Amino acid sequence: MTSKKTILLVDDDIDLLENTSYMVKSMGHDVITAQDGLEAVLKYKDIRPNLTIMDIKMPKMDGFDAFFKMKQFDPDAKIILITAFSMDEKKHLKAKSMSLITTIHKPYSFEQLEEMVNKYA
């Protein structure tokens, strides 16, 4: 059994956020949630999670801009971006150059999520 970690989940889709939160909690980890990039950055600074899993397309601040702010605050931040859409290739390349772990596409399975959390948290 892996040790309990704190995971920050960020998505503006409430149903997906609740389902993903349930899945991560079922793995034995603590979950903190945010519904937009701005809230995510503030919570990241406050809790310093072991891993952040964040949607790209969100209101107030998108996932890329939140990623850049988190990395500016903590260059060692572990962040996975998720998307259901095509992405801004320039921002994606910049994020990869700043140690973006990976980008996964919606819908993702419990197994994919579990693998990512176990590997990177």
Regions flagged by a language model, labelled:
Residues M1-T6, E111-A121:
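Non-catalytic signal-transmission and effector/linker regions of two-component phosphorelay proteins
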Residues D12, M54-D55:
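Active-site T/S-Asp motif of two-component receiver
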Residues I14-I32, M98, Y120:
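Two-component/phosphorelay signaling modules centered on CheY-like receiver
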Residues Q35-E39, D62-A66:
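Acidic catalytic/metal-coordinating carboxylates
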Residues I47-I53:
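Active-site beta3 strand of CheY-like receiver
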Residues M58:
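Receiver (REC) domain active-site loop signature in two-component systems and cognate sites
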Residues D65, S86-I104, E111-E115:
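Alpha4 helix (beta4-alpha4-beta5 surface) of REC/receiver domains from two-component response regulators
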Residues I82-T83:
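Hydrophobic/aromatic residues positioned on beta-strands within the core alpha/beta folds
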